[in-house]
Structure formats: C-alpha cells, structure tokens
C-alpha cells in the first residue's frame, strides 16, 4: 500500500481527513434540535453551500470511475449527461418556487399535496429501493475499484482492498451523517467540492502533458485505428526492454501492411534495432482486426537494479493488442443511431427526460435546495451548481481519453485501460502512475471526497424519506427529538444494507459502470418526471391519472429490466425473446430510446385517465400548479431574482452551446 506514496502524499491525506472530520464534529456540536434542523439544515443555507452541495452530491465515485471509463472507451459521448447542467436552471427558475411555497420536506410529500396519499407512499417506497439498488451499489462498487487500483496490496491481512475500501467508506461516512444530519452533509460537501476540483484538475493537466498536449490527444483519439482489446499472457524471463516480434501476415490480408504502418505510428513504441512490428490476422477476432504483439518489462522495472543493466534477465509481460480497422471518433458527441449505448436521437430526446427527473424531482438532489433560507438563495445555488456541473466534461471524461492515449503510446502500466471491461480503471491508474509524488495525496483525497459525498447524500436522503414519508405517517404524534433519532437509526440501517449489498454489487456490475447506472435510471425516471411536470403545468391532471401513469410506467420499466437480463442468458427465455420481433426490440433497443417510450406511454395514460375522471379539487391545484399561483406568490418569485441572475443564466446556456458546437462532428448518420 505504501509503495509510490511519499511523506507529502500522506500529509495531504491526513490534512484532508482532519479538516473533514473537524468540520463534521463542529456541526455535531451545533445540535439538531428539530427534524427541520436535522433534515433541512435549519433552512438557513446560502447559495454557495447549496451549489457546492449539488455538485458534490452528484459527482460521486461513479463519475470519477464511470465517466473516465466511458471516455477511455467511447470518448465524449457520455458528455451529454454532464451537459444537462441546464436542467438545474429548470429546477431553480421553475420548480423551486413550488417546492418552497408548499413547505414540503420531501418530493413524495409534494405529490401527496398535489395528488393523493397513495402517490406519496408509492414514490417513497420506490425511491428507497432504487437508492439502495442503484446509487449505493454503484458508489460502493466504484469505491472498491478505486481502492483496488490505488492499493493492490492487502491492507489488513489477506482482505481484498476492494472490500476494505467499500466497507471503510461506508462506515466512516455513515458515522458523520448519522451524527450531524443534513447540515453535516452540506458543509462537508462544500469542502469536498474544492478538494475534488483541485485533484481532478491536477490529473487532467499532468495527463495532458504526458500524452503530448491537447492537439496530440486529438490526433491519437480521432481518425486512428481503435484498440479493441488487450490480453496479457504469462510473464517470462527476457533480456529486452520493449520489442515487437515478427510474425509474417498471411498473403490474403490485403491492406494489412497499411494497417501495420498505422499501428506502428499509433502505438508510438521504440522498436529495438532489427525488430519489426508483429502483425497478423487474429482468427479469434473479427476479420476486420489485426494483432500487435508487444513484450515489455513489468511495471516495477524502473525500481529494480536490473533496470540499469538492460542485458540482465528481466521479467517481462507479453501483450497482444488487437487493432480494429474502425477509426476512432472520440471527439464527437454524436454517435450513429446504430450505436448500442449512445445513439444521437436517443441522447437528444431521451437523455434530457432522465436529466429533468434527476435534477428537478429526485429527493437526492432537490433536498439541497430545500435547505435555502429563501427562493433567491435556492435559485442562485442552482445556477452556481450548473456552472460546476460542466467541469466533469473536462475533469473526468477527458482524463479517460488521456489514459487511452497514454496506453496506446506504449505505456504498459496503463494497458489495463484497453482490456475488455478495464476502462473503469482509467482514472485511478492515472493517479497511480502519472502523478508525481506530492500530488497523489491531494488527488486521492479528491477520490475519497467523491466517495464520501455520494454516500453521505444518499444516506441522508434515505433517512429523510423513511422518517418523514413513512414513519411520521405511522406515528403522527412523534416528537421532534424522536424523529431526529429515528432518522439516525434509519441512516444506520441504510449503512448496514450498503455493507450487506457489497457481494451482490460485484455480480451486478459486470461491464460498463456508467452504462448500468444510466440504463436503470432510464427505466425508473420517465414516469416520475411525467407525473411531476404534468402535475405542475396541467391543472386537469388528477390523482387517478397520476397513479395510473406511475403504475404503467413502473411495470414497463421493470419488464424492460427483467427482459434485458433474461435476453442475455443462455436459457429458453433468451431463445424465446430472440425469436419474437417485438420482445427482441423491447429488450434490445437502446436505453435512451426506451426512456422516450416510457415517458410518452406514462404521459398518455396520465392525460387519458385524468380526462375520463373528475377534475381534481381546488385545494390540489391552488399554489401547486403554474396557473394556480396566487398574486403574492408570483410577486415573491419575481422579487427573488435580478439582472445578474439572468446574465449568469444566459452565460451558462452560451457555455453549454459552445461545448456542443466544438465537439460536434457528423451528427446525422
């Protein structure tokens, strides 16, 4: 574990934990006297704390690991989800006035006031289950990957560091979340935001320097052959540093010599005098790929005495690098509609539906704005958070591309990034092998900040949902002190569930981490988004329509998820699905397309049932719909912003459009 970390690294880590735990302890000493204090931080937070908390709670370990992984595998495609910063503007300018004027603690509570008690219970239970199965599980898995990549040697006995890291983060974060409540989450996240931005910025700048600068990264990741797979064979004793052994390609390879030249330039590896690139058609891979065999010294070679004498026998690892004739297109946001994960039509129309659900209606996010002292502070917090939200495009996705570029230029320490399923290791491997001693501690602190902020946010949101939406309904006469302690016990129980879920996480997370998260959210979010937005903008929508839309949307979403799992199996169910055109489409179409269909189906059911049933009573629409606002509420909302808020909003939209323009290639394919 100690290998590669210097005194200053450990000093930075120690300083980070000292400041973090000191802040948490200071918050605990402030005492949470009521449920309002514990769950909404006393409703006294300012715009900076709110914006930083929005960013830190969203940017968790799944972003550091998952976004960098998608950057190493598909380039800028996943940036669409990070450019949903504009959804925060919708939250601040449109949704917050309804939430704050209604005085609710939770999003399910808002649904009860707009529709019925059944809507509140349904959303509360479903949200709790989805948090445990998605947010907690994804964060724990990503945390385990980070610890395993940074510290491969066991810390305690023979315990795998994947397990140690996941359990350690869960317990530590759970302790200060239980003790300090929402106020502890807010103020520790403000610190973690600074650490995270500084740490990720160091990785980006030093990584770009290592790969040769921005233009070199574009050259490597745009228009060159794609490295489609890497396998590592057994280590052998060898007296060479880096050689490419010659294997004659078959005569019928056609244009293989051209690819051979591309491969040599693509890898940019020093070839020992007399040696030539080893290229052949790989019979186990598609005919459109070739193989480069590379023998290189082990990653710790530079730390051995043998490194000074290249004639001495050294342990080397033989790598087989599979190059596809497909050209890289990493700097293009728009993929063809045939792309399995990121078709441009689905990203343009389906992904925003998930973004509006997440940023405008999910308890995990909206709870931060409910802590504001007034609407003005809440709105400015969302604007500030939206600006911060654009940073991941460059701080997390681009480093993944940098890791790919460094690996394809011959740095075998980063070759795991090129392996099947190994892209998720891009960010932690950059930290481990590219950063100099002294900066690693700061960046590892940023990684830990992402882990802990994600867990703290979901723990507090879960305890709030359980205590306010479920327990308080069952025990309506519970005192404020009693509710605070129930919230703490609920958090402790969530922590325990998180630990017990770790073994299942390993099974669930086979493949791309971020794809898994976005696909599940695409099956959960659309019906909830439809219920909230139609409820606010259409007074005619009633409780019957709400419950019908939620039921249809959830059933279709679960059916898609189960069908997708069955279709990937080897049993009779997979054969049945493959033979049925509709089932094959339903289980195989991109999750971005499915988000569109789920939203359309849920909205159609909500509107149809509402029109066929009586209008909602006046108390369900007054102050809770756009046209039902009073003159006083409109005046209060108008008094909460000035020209600088408008200028900041326009500036954000301009920044987003600029990024879209810069990274747009041939879109309609």
Q: What do these predicted ranges mean?
A:
Residues 1-669:
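Membrane-embedded helix-loop-helix hairpins and adjacent transmembrane boundary segments
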């Amino acid at each position: 574990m100690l290998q590669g970390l210097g005194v200053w690294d450990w000093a930075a880590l120690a300083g980070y934990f000292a400041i973090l735990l000191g802040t948490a302890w200071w918050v605990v000493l402030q005492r949470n006297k009521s449920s309002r204090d514990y769950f909404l931080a006393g409703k006294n937070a300012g715009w900076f704390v709110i914006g930083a908390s929005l960013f830190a709670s969203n940017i968790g370990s799944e972003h550091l690991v998952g976004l960098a992984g998608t950057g190493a595998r598909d380039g800028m495609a996943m940036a669409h989800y990070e450019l949903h910063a504009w959804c925060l503007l919708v939250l601040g300018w449109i949704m917050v006035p309804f939430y704050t004027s209604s005085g609710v603690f939770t999003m399910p509570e808002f649904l009860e006031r707009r529709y019925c008690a059944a809507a509140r219970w349904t959303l509360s239970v479903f949200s709790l289950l989805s948090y445990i199965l998605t947010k907690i599980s994804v964060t724990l898995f990503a945390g385990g990957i980070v610890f395993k990549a940074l510290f491969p040697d066991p810390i305690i006995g023979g315990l795998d560091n994947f397990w140690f890291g996941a359990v350690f983060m869960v317990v530590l974060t759970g302790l200060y979340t239980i003790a300090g409540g929402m106020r502890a989450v807010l103020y520790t996240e403000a610190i973690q935001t600074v650490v995270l931005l500084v740490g990720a910025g160091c990785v980006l700048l030093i990584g770009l320097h290592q790969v040769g600068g921005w233009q070199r990264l574009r050259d490597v990741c745009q228009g060159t052959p794609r490295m489609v797979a890497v396998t590592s064979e057994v280590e052998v004793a060898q007296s060479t540093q880096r050689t490419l052994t010659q294997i004659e390609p078959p005569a019928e390879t056609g244009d293989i010599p051209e690819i051979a030249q591309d491969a040599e330039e693509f890898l940019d590896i020093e070839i020992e005098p007399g040696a030539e690139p080893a290229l052949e058609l790989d019979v186990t891979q598609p005919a459109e790929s070739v193989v480069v065999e590379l023998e290189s010294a082990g990653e710790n070679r530079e730390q051995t005495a043998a490194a000074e004498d290249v004639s001495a026998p050294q342990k080397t690892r033989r790598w087989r690098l599979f190059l596809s004739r497909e050209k890289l297109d990493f700097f293009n946001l728009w993929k063809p509609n045939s792309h399995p994960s990121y078709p441009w039509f689905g990203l343009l129309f389906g992904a925003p539906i998930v973004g509006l659900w997440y940023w405008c209606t999910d308890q995990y996010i909206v709870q931060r704005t409910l802590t504001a002292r007034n609407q003005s502070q809440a709105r400015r917090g969302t604007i500030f958070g939206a600006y911060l939200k654009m940073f991941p495009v460059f701080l997390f996705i681009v480093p993944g591309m940098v890791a790919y570029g460094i690996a394809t230029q011959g740095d075998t320490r980063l070759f795991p990034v090129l392996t099947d399923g190994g892209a998720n290791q891009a960010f932690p491997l950059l930290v481990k092998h590219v950063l100099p001693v002294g900066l690693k501690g700061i960046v590892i602190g940023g990684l830990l900040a992402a882990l802990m902020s994600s867990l703290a946010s979901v723990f507090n949101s879960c305890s709030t949902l359980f205590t306010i939406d479920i327990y308080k309904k069952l025990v309506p006469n519970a005192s404020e002190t009693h509710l605070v302690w129930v919230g703490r016990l609920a958090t402790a129980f969530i922590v325990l569930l998180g630990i017990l879920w770790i073994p299942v996480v390993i099974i669930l997370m086979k493949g791309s981490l971020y794809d898994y998260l976005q696909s599940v959210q695409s099956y959960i979010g659309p019906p909830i988004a439809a219920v909230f937005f139609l409820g606010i903008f259409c007074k005619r929508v009633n409780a019957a329509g709400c419950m019908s839309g939620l039921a249809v949307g959830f059933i279709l979403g679960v059916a898609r998820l189960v069908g997708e799992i069955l279709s990937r199996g080897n049993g009779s169910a997979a054969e049945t699905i493959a033979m049925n055109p509709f089932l094959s489409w339903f289980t195989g179409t991109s999750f971005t397309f499915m988000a569109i269909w789920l939203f359309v189906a849920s909205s159609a059911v909500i509107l149809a049932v509402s029109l066929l049933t009586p209008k909602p009573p006046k108390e369900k629409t007054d102050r809770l719909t756009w046209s039902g606002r009073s003159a006083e509420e409109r005046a209060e909302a108008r008094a909460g912003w000035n020209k600088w808020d408008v200028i900041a909003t326009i500036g954000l939209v301009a920044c987003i459009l600029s990024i879209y323009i810069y990274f747009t290639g041939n879109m309609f394919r």
